[in-house]
From Swiss-Prot:
This is Methionyl-tRNA formyltransferase. It comes from the Bacteria. (6S)-5,6,7,8-tetrahydrofolate binds at residues 113-116. Coiled coil: none annotated. Attaches a formyl group to the free amino group of methionyl-tRNA(fMet). The formyl group appears to play a dual role in the initiator identity of N-formylmethionyl-tRNA by promoting its recognition by IF2 and preventing the misappropriation of this tRNA by the elongation apparatus. Keywords: Protein biosynthesis, Transferase. The gene is fmt. It catalyses: L-methionyl-tRNA(fMet) + (6R)-10-formyltetrahydrofolate = N-formyl-L-methionyl-tRNA(fMet) + (6S)-5,6,7,8-tetrahydrofolate + H(+). Gene3D superfamilies: Formyl transferase, C-terminal domain (3.10.25.10), Formyl transferase, N-terminal domain (3.40.50.170). It comes from Enterobacter sp. (strain 638).
Amino acid sequence: MSKKLRIIFAGTPDFAARHLDALLSSGHQIVGVFTQPDRPAGRGKKLMPGPVKVLAEKHNLPVFQPVSLRPQENQQLVSDLNADVMVVVAYGLILPKAVLDMPRLGCINVHGSLLPRWRGAAPIQRSLWAGDSETGVTIMRMDVGLDTGDMLYKLACPITAEDTSATLYDKLADLGPQGLIETLQQLADGKAQPEVQDEAFVTYAEKLSKEEAQLDWSLSAAQLERCIRAFNPWPMSWMTIDEQPVKIWKASVINREAKAEPGTIIEATREGIQVATADGILNLESLQPAGKKAMSAQDLLNSRREWFTPGTRLA
């Protein structure tokens, strides 16, 4: 293989762990792993390690969990490892310029979009909601900006009409390691060809909120269907029926004129709950009332048919 690199890996969730797993079999030397501090989880709020820490400890790698990399003593942890490159994947902490400049070859990041489209925190969800036909991963050299660094490698994948954020996440988690290993080989061989991002094509993927997951019936059926897929599995699209929140797991578009005010129930059958939108009809197929598991429209109608009387306006 190419020259063996000394690598610091920084990441926290499962998406990052899949990249660390690929590095473990790449032949490069992982000299340290930075990951976020353990977080309370579950009903007992017990402190639990993230997937990257679990994998790193399984392979006896040195693990560091600073709350911030701004203090000088925490930056010294990075410096002391004398790394050739730092690989950052969904780490969750800001890297100050001093840290970015420490590795000989700099810091590189795996980002879940085809930059410069969808810089920011939620590129997978935003690409789905926008109706993009494809997305992918970009390996970039990090600088002090928000996903503004020069691009080193890009891999694309199609977005299908069935994709949710969960399925797209899995696709990109498989693509990313391929691009990362190839990029590291290019860096080691001195063959990397950085490409400056074109600012004319920049879009931003703002962090998701539970509030924007509430279905807005003034949008079209196509937009709402994409919203439902984009917000699955978090924070989940929802609506209010009889003053109770109901999450929507799956829906489809019926391309015909609603002939009713947006948010009005048109029909309720075993195939779904048909709701008028600003353009077309949204057919709700899988729903989850508060405190219940997700169920088909038919199962929900069996217990709550009074909720779905044609002519009822949904909030």
